A protein has these predicted regions:
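Glycine-rich phosphate-binding active-site loops on the catalytic face of alpha/beta enzymes
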Residues: 1-6, 52-59, 72-73, 77-78, ...
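Structural alpha-beta junctions
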Residues: 16-27, 43-45, 68, 90-96, ...
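Conserved, mostly hydrophobic/aromatic
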Residues: 84
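Conserved anion-binding
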Residues: 1-71, 77-80
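A generic structural motif
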Residues: 27-33, 51-53, 98-105, 132-135
Length: 135
């Protein structure tokens, strides 16, 4: 994750170099950088993470789309996720993944119960395919 990497440090041949590692995905976080960074790196194994809270875990509904795989972070949890999903559907954003690090913690500790609750919700909403036939 190239979070907070000053654009001056980016190698002009970065796209070429990243393609040498096709089994790895490189994520460019677009919170502290200009959003162009994730889009300008032209390698198939790159994606963009948009976190308007700059890693502070604060929910925002200021969504943006990108011309490559992308995901969202920032205050997502079991309470805010349905609101976010409704917005993504309404705006037809088609995001690919979410980052919920703080949203699955209870008093700073990772909670498998919270993860399970979120996965069950996402499966019910059709965002995760469980292997079972859907009606």
């Amino acid at each position: 994750n190239f979070h907070g990497m000053p654009y001056q440090l980016l190698d002009p041949k970065l796209s070429e170099k990243l393609q040498k590692f096709p089994k790895k995905e490189f994520i460019f976080q677009a919170d502290t950088l200009n959003t162009w960074i994730g889009e300008s790196v032209d390698a198939p194994n790159t994606s963009v993470l948009l976190d308007n809270s700059h890693g502070a875990g604060v929910f925002s509904n200021n969504w943006k789309t990108f011309n490559k795989p992308y995901g969202y972070a920032g205050g997502l949890n079991i309470d805010t996720l349905p609101v976010a999903i409704d917005e993504w559907r309404t705006q037809n954003l088609g995001m690919k993944w979410i980052d919920m690090e703080t949203g699955v913690r209870n008093n700073g500790e990772f909670s498998t119960a919270m993860v399970t609750e979120i996965l069950e919700y996402l499966t019910t909403e059709g965002y995760i395919y469980s292997g079972k036939k859907r009606n």
